[in-house]
Amino acid sequence: DLIRNCKRMLLLTSAGMSADSNIPTFRDKDGYWKNFPPFKEKNLEAQDLASPWAFRNELPHAWAFYEWRRRNANDNQPHEGYRIINEWFKKCDGFIHTTNTDGLHLMSGCDRDRILEVHGSMWRLQCLDTCTHQYWDDVSVPLCDLDNETMRASNFPGCIHCRSIARPHILMFGDGEYTGHPEQGINFRNFIEKSVDLAILVGSSGAVPTNDYIALHLMESGTEVININLDASSNQIVNTDLFIEMKGKDAFVELNRIAFE
């Protein structure tokens, strides 16, 4: 009934949402080292490469990391859960607040006015030297050359304004140069100004608790919150009774069956 009768719904999606589409979470350090031996040799962890420091000091490796991720996302497809969310949004006023940068919600056909990619998107670029606060779309695959043996990139994309090197339009670790997406931010603020009937928290982790705190705030103001996560400990912050210990894809398929079939 919560889903079927919902008038205003907020989806709070994190890494666990896209994991079923073969998008790595990089939480498993051993798995990360296995996938990228050259990074292990230099002791470059994922958060080291996802930083402005890497783009200034380890540029070939930094762009290789993101080029690999762009190609991986391009080779995979949004899973059934994304389609189900889009179908639900045809029945209610909905919005997606995602910490994911893989662009899968938009690839699945999500309305561009109904999403805030709060950490940015790997499918947009901005100037590494911040010659302007503008950003631009670039969905080219490949975007630059990539040597998978050495995990070094070359022929980097350039800024369309000053011809310097471009970087992903993503909020990285230790990043004071991310230009943000004001339009998406305004759309989210406008949505959240009115009461929300149901918030669904998906695949969040304690490492990036952005969505957890939004869910907690909404729950304290009377919004029903469903938490979908394979990790039972993920419910410690929100502590909702509506906890579903399942993968994101499987949970949405089951919830859709219960609500509408």
Language-model features, listed with the residues they occupy:
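Conserved catalytic core of sirtuin-type NAD+-dependent deacylases
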Residues: 1-261
